[in-house]
Amino acid sequence: MIKKENLDKTSAWPFVEAKKLLRERKSFIEKKGKITLQTGYGPSGLPHIGTFGEVARTTMMVNALKQLSDFPTEIITFSDDMDGLRKVPDNVPNQELLKENLHKSLTQVPDPFEKFSSFGEHNNEMLKKFLDSFKFNYNFQSSTTLYKSGFFNPTLKIILENYEGIMNIIIPTLGKERQQTYSPFLPICPETGHVLEIPVIEIDKEKSNIIFDNKGKKLETSILDGNCKLQWKVDWAMRWYALDIDFEMYGKDLIESAILSTKIINLLGKKNPSGFAYELFLDEKGEKISKSKGNGITIDQWLEYASPESLSLYMYQNPKRAKKLYKEIVPKAVDEYLDCIEKSKKQNELQLLMNPVWHVHNGNIPEEEMIMTFSMLLNLVETSNADNKDLLWKFVKKYKLDISETNFPIFDALVGYAIKYFNDVIKAQKKYKTPNESEKKALEALVKTLEKCTDEMSPEDIQTLIYSTGKENGYADNLRDWFKLIYEVVFGDENGPRMGFFISFFGVKETTELLMNKLK
């Protein structure tokens, strides 16, 4: 049990947001006896890493809430699968099939992968599959199911009752042209199945019907049982109302929507949920990651190169700062995860609550000793030419005699990830430097220094000798350039490992031969 004084003191963001939620929603939570958090998913494209981030962060909030409160918690993962398909995603097959079904609800669009009854169902199943793989606890809800089953009917009637008030909230935020055509209700065309964005001529609150102008023809339809869906901002407010949501986080691009949805739920007679706006996920070019574009790194790619926990840690850090998500950030993210595990071993309870791995592992932090960084392991893959785990483990065991794959499961997984990442990402990017005459002379002096070293020497002693060699060969004023030269010649990169440690690990003789081969 965590001490109350430490729970009061911690400034870790999941605890800060959980305390804010309990403050703002106290009476509502006490009345219903549980805390309901929501995450949203638009299944117009495949689930991407940003989708994972929202569920992971909300789960961290739940973990904090469990320390602060005895109320049961629930995460609703809501899929907007009744939305119309507005454009064909770039990263799916059967593009023509999707073109033919534009503007239909996603659960009425055929599955281009030919596995499920609709494109919406396919993407929902992909979402559930990947959330399950991370062992998230969530309650999946489908917009189509809740509309068509009548679950939303009582709230839809309240929205129709407040039609004029809702229009007064939304209309001032629209351009003049859009003001003429806007309607909070989008009927599903009985002939084409399209989600129609057409103006309302008349509403019948008693019958729960609306009359539209459909290309000069009057169309009367019920707003109930899935015959209509709501425009986004009104739909979001309805969801909060009908599902009694206490908390939802959202990207900063939805801040304006959240303000309007808040006004709408307040108009309907309920208090809005507690909210949290996070910064967006960007690709390497700084562009927003999009489900339909498939840009940035995918979840599957990350999991080929690193553990789910390293991804969770990346999501934990600085949620209010924009994050670039692409392949090259993986090693740094993995090393930060390993470093946080190491730090946790010497931390007191309050410090642990501030450590990201406490939130990643919900307090059950692994106790495994971290043998080396992922970056170092990548250098070892390159220099050893190891193309399988067994071969790489041989090098590791030469340095650490008392370790085995079974006793070091995190490191064993890292070995596999390092081989895959090096071959897929790093290999093609390597640019090895050809040293000029003076640089070659300095590196030949380093070879002579290494020939005098032994494997019994400490990494610190070897590092000192490398420093001395650099100073004696023209790098006394800039040792940074000396190490940069070594890295560019040996590793094909401007940065590299601490050389004393690397040589101790890889072997003095092996490193000497490696350097000699590079100088040929």
Where are the language model's segments positioned?
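N-terminal catalytic cores of NTP/NDP-binding nucleotidyl/phosphoryl-transfer enzymes
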Residues: 2-93, 235-257
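Glycine-rich, histidine-containing beta strand-loop boundary motifs that form or position
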Residues: 39-41, 77-79, 134, 142-144, ...
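Active-site cores that bind ATP or allylic diphosphates and position pyrophosphate for catalysis
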Residues: 136-299
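Basic, alpha-helical terminal appendages of large translation-related enzymes
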Residues: 1-34, 47, 74-76, 167, ...
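Residue-level signal for inorganic ion chemistry
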Residues: 48, 159, 307, 486
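A glycine-rich helix N-cap at a beta->alpha junction
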Residues: 96-130, 134
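Catalytic adenosine-cofactor/nucleotide-binding cores of aminoacyl-tRNA synthetases and other
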Residues: 253, 258, 279-416, 491-520
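Charged, often glycine-rich, active-site loop that binds/positions anionic groups
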Residues: 82-99, 155-160, 288, 293
